[in-house]
């Protein structure tokens, strides 16, 4: 770490390891990126960020989908509701839907309810300002698509742009400026939503508080 200008912490399919893996990097004072999924739950996310904040280490985490060009055309202040769908396996792939959804809704989720079969799930999300959104996953795969209802109409977006390239540009910019493009509190809220979503999938048809 001493010879590094910036650090990347990778454990993409085992986010429960991030808290342990982040202890030294996030105490180093050097800019750090933690790969998605940031943490398994809200409490762990808060603990990880607390280490960085105590040492003054710039850090952030995101799904690369946040950088898709398609989302840039949407004015978050006009969003009324969102339907999002993508691949199945909530534990691994849901972050790629939750991240852009939270970026566009710009409100704190209050509670969630799930329905599911062996091949599909639907997660309904109610936000504290009364708006709602949904996330669906499909066993045999799906492109990342959103139907966004706004005050001016409805827009269907399918992600086809080179979002990973745009993400890398954002990552390089972060290492240069040490300014995180995603606030810690937003990432914590996304982890809280993911945690509640996982609980909701175990009790279909029941509301679970975030």
Language-model features, listed with the residues they occupy:
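A contiguous active-site-proximal alpha/beta segment in oxidoreductase catalytic domains
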Residues: 32-33, 38-97
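Rossmann-like dinucleotide-binding domain that binds NAD(P)(H)
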Residues: 80-143, 185-192
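Beta-loop-alpha module in the N-terminal Rossmann-like domain of NAD(P)-dependent dehydrogenases
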Residues: 1-49
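Glycine-centered short loops/turns at secondary-structure junctions
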Residues: 29, 56, 204-205
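Generic hydrophobic alpha-helical segments
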Residues: 22, 170-171, 197
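C-terminal helix-rich "cap/oligomerization" subdomain common to oxidoreductases
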Residues: 3-13, 174-210
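C-terminal substrate-binding/catalytic lobe of Rossmann-fold NAD(P)-dependent oxidoreductases
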Residues: 121-171
């Amino acid at each position: 770490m001493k010879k590094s200008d910036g650090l990347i912490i990778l454990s993409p399919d085992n986010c429960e390891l991030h808290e342990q893996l982040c202890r030294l990097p996030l105490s180093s004072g050097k800019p750090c990126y933690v790969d998605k999924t940031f943490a398994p739950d809200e409490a762990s996310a808060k603990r990880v960020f607390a280490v960085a904040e105590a040492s003054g280490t710039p850090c952030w985490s995101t799904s690369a989908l946040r950088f898709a060009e398609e989302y840039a055309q949407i004015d978050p202040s006009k969003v009324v509701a969102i339907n999002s769908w993508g691949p199945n396996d909530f534990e691994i792939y849901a972050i790629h839907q939750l991240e852009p959804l939270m970026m566009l809704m710009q409100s704190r989720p209050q509670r969630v309810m799930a329905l599911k079969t062996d091949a599909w799930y639907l997660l309904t999300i109610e936000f504290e300002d009364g708006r709602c959104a949904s996330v669906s996953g499909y066993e045999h795969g799906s492109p990342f698509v959103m139907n966004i209802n706004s005050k001016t109409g409805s827009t269907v977006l399918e992600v086809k742009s080179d979002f990973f390239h745009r993400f890398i540009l954002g990552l390089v910019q972060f290492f240069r400026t040490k300014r995180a493009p995603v606030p810690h509190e937003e990432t914590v809220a996304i982890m809280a939503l993911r945690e509640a979503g996982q609980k909701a999938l175990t009790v279909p048809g029941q509301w679970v508080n975030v």
